[in-house]
From Swiss-Prot:
This is Histidine N-alpha-methyltransferase. It comes from the Bacteria. Pathway: Amino-acid biosynthesis; ergothioneine biosynthesis. Monomer. L-histidine binds at residues 56, 166, 206, 282-284. It comes from Mycobacterium tuberculosis (strain ATCC 25618 / H37Rv). Signal peptide: none annotated. Catalyzes the SAM-dependent triple methylation of the alpha-amino group of histidine to form hercynine, a step in the biosynthesis pathway of ergothioneine.
Length: 321
């Protein structure tokens, strides 16, 4: 069956975006970096380790829901096309593909990601395992290229892993509204959201005793050193995970052990860190069930199903246009 890859990003788009984000973020107060720059090869491997840690429950909880409810998702949405926002070849993706195939409706898979190499790997794996399924991969950015997602058929858009939580309320509303704008009558959205719970348990999920998450957090500095000719002393920053109760979100920071002057050669930029100064590297917003429904409604979507895992740690919403 046909495989196509539509690349809407230039070859140097990722590098240019990194330059913009680092130049802007290092001059803010407090300094900050977007979490997408964690994920080079090393960072992706570290995150895979994180998802298997006993303290990190979200991946297991979401998979538990999908094992129990994928058939219900398939029956409720009656989709023939699975659009995966943030491509992957995980067990969770396969559970949904299998449910649609078992129902007899699966015709097309549309992985959407900013990373062309990830898309290529995804397309190859899915083509091998799901013969007869048309694959239309889209390489693009959520902020610019949602309109490039192929139309036609009944589409199930899937945004899992509580990745939506990396967006603060304003950008999150903009994203959901933009996504609803490209959906057509008959289309559905399956959205994964991590739920508000005991603060100590949340912090443990982002600050494991083995230090894997700390390595993952510091890796963003190694990425900048390599890609932008910077000289961060990576080991002179400590990982900090903190629950912000007012905003109901986990925040990850990097705290400088001592004063440090950093030169970013590719940007002709020099920045100073004071001892104890913290730089924000990720927010992970947590959600309450009613609030998720309200945010979907504000974007023009109607939630038709709501599921949680047995412990009530994680929620999946199925919403329709």
């Amino acid at each position: 069956m046909r495989v196509s890859v539509a690349n809407h990003l230039g070859e140097d788009a990722g590098h240019l975006a990194l330059r913009r984000d680092v130049y802007s973020g290092l001059q803010k107060t407090p300094k900050s970096l977007p979490p997408k720059w964690f994920y080079d090869t090393v960072g992706s491997e570290l995150f895979d380790q994180i998802t298997r840690l006993p303290e990190y429950y979200p991946t297991r909880a979401e998979a538990e829901i999908l094992r129990a409810r994928s058939a219900e998702v398939a029956s409720a949405c009656r989709a023939d096309t699975l659009v995966e926002l943030g491509s992957g070849t995980s067990e969770k993706t396969r559970m949904l593909l299998d449910a649609l195939r078992h129902r007899g409706s699966l015709r097309r898979f549309v992985p959407f990601d900013v990373d062309a190499s990830v898309l290529s790997a995804t397309a190859t794996a899915i083509q091998r395992e799901y013969s007869g399924v048309e694959i239309n991969a889209v390489c693009g950015d959520f902020e610019e290229h949602l309109t490039e997602i192929p139309r036609g058929g009944r589409r199930l858009f899937v945004f899992l892993g509580s990745t939506i939580g990396n967006l603060t309320p304003g950008p999150r509303a903009q994203f959901l509204t933009a996504l609803a704008g490209v959906m057509r009558p008959g289309d559905s959205l399956l959205l994964g959201t991590d739920l508000v719970k005991d603060a100590a348990r949340l912090v443990r999920a982002y600050d494991d005793p083995g230090g894997v998450t700390a390595q993952f957090n510091r890796n963003v500095l190694a990425v900048i050193n390599r890609e932008l000719e910077a000289d961060f002393d990576v080991d002179a920053f400590q990982h900090v995970a903190r629950w912000n109760s007012a905003e109901e979100r986990i925040e990850m920071w990097l705290r400088a052990d001592g004063r440090q002057r950093v030169r970013v050669g590719a940007l002709d930029l020099t920045v100073d860190f004071d001892a104890g100064e913290e730089m924000l590297t990720e927010v992970s917003c947590k959600f309450r069930p009613q609030a998720v429904g309200a945010e979907l409604a504000a974007a023009g979507l109607h939630r038709i199903r709501w599921w949680t895992d047995e412990a009530g740690d994680f929620g999946l919403s199925l919403a329709a246009k």
